[in-house]
Amino acid sequence: MFFSFHFHSNLRSVVVMKFQKVYSVFFQVHHLLDLYDEEITKDAYGKTIRAKTMGQRIYINAMKRNDLVFGIGPAGTGKTFLAVVYAAKQLRKGSVKRIVLTRPAVEAGESLGFLPGDLKEKVDPYLRPLYDGLNTVLGREQTQRLIERGVIEIAPLAYMRGRTLDDAFVILDEAQNTTHAQMKMFLTRLGFGSKMVVTGDQTQIDLPKGVKSGLKEAVKKLSGVSGISIMKMDQSDVVRHPLVSKIINRYEGVE
């Protein structure tokens, strides 16, 4: 009698535990599906912009919850575009007063000194991905007006030195090409009421041989710090042509 009671009691406990696990999984799946349906913002034509992968959704949530976010991943994951989209949304809402866009002037051996024209003309080719996001959300004409008024500021990373960026949404793109000193300088510009997003691809470093990437070092040093989120995306988050994922896999030695 006691054995039978004990057996049924244990069986009931096992059934309850399994039910709880199934319910937990169901709840998580349901929650993830809801996240896909959640609107990030609308573009300049009123069309809804949503996350296209789970990695992108987690990335957006990280920007909502943290003042400093690292978005790391290969080409095509939307890490830069989504950062700009979210920055534009915060500007629209009045959560920030301006957007500051920057990136290091290191691209496959080139430097700004060898490019023609004034500062804007020199910087523009390096910031094209950032412009694309702004034009999508705000429209080309409004983006240009905001740049002219200084609400959107676009500058090389070197121009960040000595500044404190309050009430701003600051994006550092191509951060894998920063040095240790540049990354430290940039991160310490964070002011009150501001958010920073640092994007980069650790497999696409164009720094001179022997120079360590400031992005790699920052990820190691700042992992686990409260208020900082390090979001790593992979080929499953690539939303470009299907061949892009295959190319990334081959170059990274993944079959």
Identify the residue ranges that each predicted region occupies.
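Interdomain "pre-motor" coupling segment immediately N-terminal to P-loop NTPase/helicase cores
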Residues: 1, 12, 16-36
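Generic preference for hydrophobic/aromatic residues in regular secondary structure cores
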Residues: 32-33, 39-40, 60, 228
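Conserved adenine-nucleotide phosphate-binding loops and their immediately adjacent elements
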Residues: 36-48
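Intrinsically disordered, low-complexity proline-rich regions
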Residues: 4-6
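Conserved helicase motor core of SF1/SF2 NTP-dependent helicases
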Residues: 46-172, 176-255
